[in-house]
Regions:
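P-loop (Walker A) phosphate-binding loop of NTP-binding proteins
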Residues: 15
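Walker A/P-loop
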Residues: 21
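Small-molecule kinase domains that catalyze NTP-dependent phosphoryl transfer to phosphate-bearing small molecules
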Residues: 116-156
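Extreme N-terminal, non-catalytic leader segments
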Residues: 1-8
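ATP-binding Walker
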Residues: 18
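ATP-dependent small-molecule kinase phosphotransfer cores
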Residues: 30-79, 83-90, 123-125
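Conserved phosphate-donor/acceptor-positioning beta-strand/loop module used by diverse small-molecule
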Residues: 81-83, 94-118
Length: 156
């Protein structure tokens, strides 16, 4: 079900602490995937959020609906931040094939520094553990799968 793209839709990807939340600050609408997952599983615990691989269909449907609602509200630039699975990207591209894909590249050392500096309450484990969770490794598959469609930004 392809949607007419009157508005700019950008999907922003990157590993943990790559700056997804602060990139495209000027967007008219930012849709944060972890907020959607929190709503689905009723938790903000990092372990629970990272154990969401089985929710890809539900997350994809919710994202498509949220993009549609934002576009109907005349939001010119809609940013989706933090998709972690290829199957979700595929679903969005089926509906919005002209969406721009942006990968934020940041060296591991810088991501670790950011992780340790932010002292977020949800960060209950070491950077090394968080960075090697199944959901983070799935994120790397996005890079591998969509390499030719990605705009790669050095975000450091």
């Amino acid at each position: 079900m392809e949607q007419s793209l009157k508005h700019r839709v950008t999907l922003v990807f990157g590993r943990i602490c790559s700056g997804k939340g602060s990139y495209f600050k000027d967007a008219d609408k930012r849709i944060v995937v972890s907020d959607i997952v929190k709503g689905i599983i009723s938790s903000s615990n990092r372990d629970a959020l990272q154990n969401s691989l089985h929710l890809d269909s539900q997350i994809g449907t919710t994202l498509i609906n949220n993009i549609y609602i934002a576009s109907m509200a005349n939001r010119e630039h809609i940013v989706v931040d933090g998709i972690r699975q290829v199957s979700i990207v595929d679903r969005i591209l089926d509906a919005y094939p002209e969406a721009e894909l942006v990968w934020l590249e940041v060296p591991v050392e810088e991501r670790k520094r950011r992780y340790e500096a932010r002292k977020d309450v949800k960060d209950v484990e070491s950077f090394e553990l968080a960075d090697n969770k199944a959901i983070e490794l799935e994120c790397q598959k996005i890079f591998d799968t969509f390499r030719n469609k990605l705009t790669i930004v050095n975000n450091y």
